[in-house]
Amino acid sequence: MNLSVEIGKIKLKNPVITASGTFGFGREYSEYIDLNKLGAIVVKGLTVKPREGNPPPRLFETASGILNSIGLQNPGVDAFIERELPFLKSFDVPVIVNIAGETVEEFVYMAEKLDIEGIEGIEINVSCPNVKKGGMAFGVNPDDIFDITRKVRKATSKTVIVKLTPNVTDIKVCAKAAEKGGADAISLINTVAGMAVDIDKRRPVFENVIGGLSGPAIKPIALKMVYEVVTVVSIPVIGMGGIMNYKDALEFLIVGARAIAVGTCNFVNPYCTVEIIDGIKKYMEENEIEDINEIIGSIKI
């Protein structure tokens, strides 16, 4: 049975990867699951310098989802290379690094810095809706997406993935801009912009006011957007948004995603990724499917 897929130059042993953010740098989850079983690990978003992130509260539960306002807390690109990468290199799993810059130059700087052994791919975060400057502004403008993608593509030999925001009028235009800029793949969706209010204080729950909604609540939005993007680009698409089990994952594969990423589910169930891999295998066995590629894009309209 073949579960392997290719995203740019990266060969994944199966199509299940971690979404940036909820999996940290893999250390905590390595105590629960065998990281070698994953298709790839996408690490928490990195910035040029360390960031402390937003003041608490940072997470707020909503109906069928979570709002987060983390603010890209991370140790910075240098500390990642020094402290986290050696740990990740000890596993037989491709490592993809998510980068978040406040300027085009910062994206390029990080891409150059991460063009090293042990890293297979760069995921450009043009879509994080948490930070007051940077991500959001880039991700809603197709010209900016094209510009960043083109410059990062020139700066690295690694597979370049562009992660799109759903908070746009037409995500297809953004996807085409990323492809035109030289992206090897597109990942979507990032969180959906949302907010919550404390009715006793009559204030927003988050100091930043707006947070990012993830979890099962956004799955139908994500699925629709992945379906739309697959029809307009010829590069691989990584689908994510509310995937909680193997059935959710299969929906994304059937509409045409080459791989899927698991985010919020990792918080709920640390075994989630490997359970999804096992579920896909079982589905293939029961339906006498020998190759995962028979499922990808098999939707009948």
Swiss-Prot record:
**Cofactor(s) this protein cannot do without:** FMN
State the pathway, as annotated in the record.
Pyrimidine metabolism; UMP biosynthesis via de novo pathway; orotate from (S)-dihydroorotate (NAD(+) route): step 1/1
Binding positions (FMN): 20, 44-45, 98, 125, 163, 189, 215, 241-242, 263-264
Q: How does it assemble?
A: Heterotetramer of 2 PyrK and 2 PyrD type B subunits.
Q: Which PANTHER family match?
A: DIHYDROOROTATE DEHYDROGENASE (FUMARATE), DIHYDROOROTATE DEHYDROGENASE (QUINONE), MITOCHONDRIAL-RELATED
- Protein name (record): Dihydroorotate dehydrogenase B (NAD(+)), catalytic subunit
Organism name: Caldanaerobacter subterraneus subsp. tengcongensis (strain DSM 15242 / JCM 11007 / NBRC 100824 / MB4) (Thermoanaerobacter tengcongensis)
- The EC number(s) given in the record are 1.3.1.14
Cell compartment(s), UniProt: Cytoplasm
- Where does the chain cross the membrane? none
Protein's GO biological process: 'de novo' pyrimidine nucleobase biosynthetic process; 'de novo' UMP biosynthetic process
Query: Binding residues for substrate, per the UniProt record?
Result: 44, 68-72, 125, 190-191
Q: Which SUPFAM superfamilies match?
A: FMN-linked oxidoreductases
Q: What is its main location?
A: cytoplasm
- Any one of the GO CC terms: cytoplasm
MF (Gene Ontology): dihydroorotate dehydrogenase (NAD+) activity
Record HAMAP family: DHO_dh_type1
